[in-house]
Amino acid sequence: MSSTVELASSFIEGAPPGEALTSDGSDIIPSLAPAFERYNEKQLTTVKLPGASQEVIVSEFNKIEGNRYFDVESQTSFGVDHVTQQASGAQSYVLESQNADLIHVEVHSRSNQCSKSLLKSLAKHAAEHYPNCSYGVYPTEDDTAVAILLVANRYSPNNFWNGRFRSIYRVPVSESTTVSGKILVDVHYYEDGNVALNTNKPINIAIPSISAESIISRIAAAERDYQEELNRAFVQMAEGAFKNLRRQLPITRQKVEWEKVGGYRLGQDISGGKGR
């Protein structure tokens, strides 16, 4: 059983976006719960809170005791069934962090000027650039930095493709002026084939100050630059490597009718029939 669990776990953790599925009634499913948990946290899986429409992120950054997670924006903690990706047991949650002001509290100065929080600035960035996405800002475990997460999913199984965009950043709250992180893009296309795109782009951003608006504007620029870089790469591949691989017809100059493959000599040879 252990080898079966290990094999199944590896399939789960390597599943493309939106394709970590289970079958009802399988005795092995409970043993795979740890693999589903690792998958959900790594992929920034999103779940809907009970009675809410907005999806929130599940990750290692917002995990608390008791296999629960918290969402800063809604000030809620919740449990997760990692196999079904369902949230439950929502409770009020108050963030305790020395960086709470930077994360989600808008500070008004004596001159009555409002300093936006990272969460507010990130929400604006997400609304402008990602039609459907979830985001979060969380303190790191030692409270020396802040984690910024954004995930956008697009599932189109009827058209045989699914995709996910993730970005993860670490913002130090010391004197450092560099935000480090990564952008990950995963796309799976599986109509009449199996094509996958998996990218991992390291990001290092110099910031002039620990200001929410400045940090998010630099992040937005980095994400825009990377998307443009991907677009250029797609064009080059389509006009170069992929074009050279493409063949409209096989060498026989006739299309293979796969549903009639038994009628071909090769099909008959394989099935033990006579060749023509």
Swiss-Prot record:
Subcellular localization(s) per the UniProt record: Cytoplasm, Cytoskeleton
Gene Ontology annotations for the cellular component aspect, listed alphabetically: actin cortical patch; cellular bud tip; cortical cytoskeleton; F-actin capping protein complex; incipient cellular bud site; mitotic actomyosin contractile ring
Keyword set, alphabetical order: Actin capping, Actin-binding, Cytoplasm, Cytoskeleton
Biological process according to GO: actin cytoskeleton organization; barbed-end actin filament capping
Domain of life: Eukaryota
Keyword Nucleotide-binding listed: no
UniProt-listed InterPro entries: CapZ_alpha (IPR002189), CapZ_alpha/beta (IPR037282), CapZ_alpha/beta_2 (IPR042276), CapZ_alpha_1 (IPR042489), F-actin_cap_asu_CS (IPR017865)
PROSITE patterns in the record: F_ACTIN_CAPPING_A_1, F_ACTIN_CAPPING_A_2
Keyword Cytoplasm: yes
Residues spanning the membrane: none
GO molecular function: actin filament binding
Pfam families the record matches: F-actin_cap_A (PF01267)
Subunit structure: Heterodimer of an alpha and a beta subunit.
Family: Belongs to the F-actin-capping protein alpha subunit family.
Record's function text: F-actin-capping proteins bind in a Ca(2+)-independent manner to the fast growing ends of actin filaments (barbed end) thereby blocking the exchange of subunits at these ends. Unlike other capping proteins (such as gelsolin and severin), these proteins do not sever actin filaments.
Name assigned to this protein: F-actin-capping protein subunit alpha
Source organism per UniProt: Aspergillus fumigatus (strain ATCC MYA-4609 / CBS 101355 / FGSC A1100 / Af293) (Neosartorya fumigata)
Gene this protein is translated from: cap1
